[in-house]
Amino acid sequence: MKKVLALITALVLTLAMAVGASASVPDKPSEFAYAYDFDGSVLSSSTKTTIEQYGAALEEATGIQTIAVVVDFLDGEDPADYATDIINSWGVGQSGENNGVVVLLARGDRKIQIGTGTGVDRVMSGAKCGDL
């Protein structure tokens, strides 16, 4: 559990230090990645590489699929709902396990949200995500 929290904390901090799209959830990308920056203006290639490494290590160690998504604005949408919408519409996590995690950065709104599938609660509750 400590390893999971450490990896997710590292992912959150990496994304937060990096400081596009609209409030509607972007279409699911055709190719899987652990980091999505839709207009390419926030995450440097080295930051994306770091996030990819943390995401792969976390999934290998725990089976939990964690992705980072950068958007510009949420246009008033609740960050928790937006992150959950990404989990559900993109199918983040293993089918039937609901063990996906989305680390969402809304750059223009200056918001960071960690959204978790219900299968992640046994490892990391929403309260623990808030502590990060």
Model-derived segments and their meaning:
Residues 2-132:
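A structural boundary signal for the start of the first folded domain, especially the loop/turn
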